[in-house]
Amino acid sequence: MNIQINNPIKADIFAAIFQNMKLFSDSVNIIFDEEKMFIQAIDSGHVAILELNIPATWFDKYAQTSMTIGVNSIILFKILSTRDKCQNIEIQCNDNADRLLIKFCSDNKTIFDKTFEMPLIDLDAELMTI
C-alpha cells in the first residue's frame, strides 16, 4: 500500500480526521481496497461505531493491495501533527509488514524531510456491519 497527499489542504483534513478519531477510539482498523480507504473504529464502551470512506481518487497517489491494518490513532495523530504545512504526506505499508512508514517531504529545502515508522497493532475486533 502506498498513498500520497500533495495538496496542503487535503493533508490538513487527513490529520484532522485522526485528531478527532483519537478522541473516539484508541485503535482503528484501516481497510484498503481498489476503490477506497475505509476506516472503522468502535468506542471503548462498545456502544458507537465510527466509519469513514475516503475514495481512492481523493489521494494524489493510491497504489494499494487489498489489506487491513490496525493502528493506534493517538500515535498516528502525534506523527501527523509534526508535519509542516507545506509538506506532502506519504504512507506506505508492505504486505505482511508489521510497521507503517510515514514520510513528510517538501520541495522547500529549508524544511527537513521527516520519516517515521509506526508499529501496527493486531485488533481482535472483526469488521462490523451496520
State what each model feature region is.
Residues 1-22, 27-130:
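DNA polymerase sliding clamps and clamp-related checkpoint/processivity subunits
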